[in-house]
Design a protein with these regions (language model features):
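A residue-level marker of the well-folded mature domains of exported/periplasmic proteins
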Residues: 23-372
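Prokaryotic Sec-type signal peptides and long signal-anchor helices
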Residues: 9-10, 188
């Protein structure tokens, strides 16, 4: 009888302990109303670029604000698998979905309307990525960036720094990459005109967002032909430019984030002269704050670019000043350039498709199309 009594007592104590533990978890300050999930597009969260910047921004915000966070990677690069990964997150109770990349437009069209209580924060998804008659539902926010401005800054800075033989290696000819590249060649040519310098620009798309032996071999020929610096624009494709640059003491321009940390550490000190950045993490943090903390979620497609002529760090497109290494084109010169762009003293053309721009008609550009 005593044995039965003590067994029942132990069971009751165990139930009590579990209940207390559960209660503690419920009261530990973690947000009970929202859970955030990020789904990636073509790449993964170690690309040292677009996906990683978005992931790190979302994860850091959620940890700071005690909001549960997870990351979902589609099993393949297809609309069906992006939809499946998104729906899986929703089924698991995640009600704020962060989506980096224009490829999520079909997923939004398929999933958002069916889940009105879920908020979707999409980066690089523009009106042109949706079907022509699609109306943005009230639970979707999209951010697009003026990458042409960041590209212009990088190209202008490179030529002012003294580089005369340049290259642009885009990942795929998607809208953001096209804007980066189009701005880059405009900036290069503007600086060349101001300094009365003759320049040459090789321009191509890898047709993928990762580097490999084939792309590296092409970069070997570029640097071997005298190219001094390549703007490597598109996920992990920068690795091919860096591998080739190592062999000739060549230089690279990073993209999306300040890539000097990874490039200079992994490949060669001083290889990365600057990076054409956009505020991916800042956008995610701002929208998560509005959605979860302030209850001010706004459904719209918002274009983000320069918001200040003087507060450089607040701009959504910029060059990094904390790791500045250029000596002929100084931070003060950069501030002057930003002021002129902000005040529209300089205008930069934009495009969303490679078909919109005849690169062969742009001075000093040798357009090579797709490398694969």
């Amino acid at each position: 009888m005593k044995k039965v009594f003590f067994s029942l007592l132990a069971a009751l104590l165990l139930v009590s302990l579990v209940a207390c533990t559960t209660k503690e978890k419920e009261n530990d300050g973690w947000n009970k109303d929202y859970k955030v999930a990020m789904v990636t597009d073509y790449g993964d969260i170690t690309d040292q670029s677009f996906n990683q910047a978005t992931y790190e921004g979302a994860k850091a915000w959620c940890e700071e604000n005690k909001v549960h966070f997870t990351y979902k990677k589609p099993v393949s690069d297809s609309d069906a698998d992006r939809i499946a990964a998104t729906e899986k997150a929703i089924d698991e109770g995640y009600n704020v979905i962060v989506m980096p990349g224009y490829a999520f437009a079909p997923t939004i069209q398929e999933v958002a309307g069916k889940n009105p209580n879920v908020k979707f924060i999409a980066l690089d998804v523009s009106k042109g990525d949706f079907a022509a008659d699609y109306e943005l539902p009230s639970n979707v926010y999209c951010a697009v960036y003026q990458e042409e401005l960041a590209g212009y800054m990088a190209g202008y800075a490179a030529v002012k720094e003294g580089y005369k033989k340049l290259g642009f290696l885009g990942g795929m000819s998607v809208p953001a990459v096209v804007r980066f590249g189009y701005g880059f060649v405009q900036g290069c040519n503007a600086a060349a005109t101001e300094t009365n310098t003759t320049i040459e620009i090789k321009y191509a798309y890898a047709k993928q967002f990762f580097g490999d032996a084939e792309i590296t071999a092409v970069m070997d020929t570029w640097y071997g032909d005298g190219v001094e610096v390549v703007f490597a624009c598109g996920g992990g494709v920068y690795t091919s430019a860096c591998e080739a640059a190592q062999k000739t003491n060549g230089k690279v321009i990073g993209v999306d984030t300040d890539q000097s940390y990874i490039i200079n550490e992994k490949y060669a000190k001083g290889m990365c002269i600057t990076s054409a950045m956009k505020g991916l993490a800042a956008t995610v943090k701002t929208q998560l704050s509005k959605t979860i903390l302030e209850g001010k979620f706004e459904s719209k497609i918002e274009t983000l670019g320069l918001v200040s002529a003087t507060d450089l760090a607040s701009n959504y497109v910029q060059l990094p000043t904390a790791t500045w290494s250029m000596t002929k084109f100084t931070v003060e010169d950069y501030k002057t350039l930003v002021g002129k762009l902000y005040n529209k003293e300089i205008t930069v053309k934009s495009a969303t498709s490679a078909d919109e721009v005849n690169f062969n008609e742009i001075p000093n550009v040798k357009y090579l199309g797709n490398l694969k």
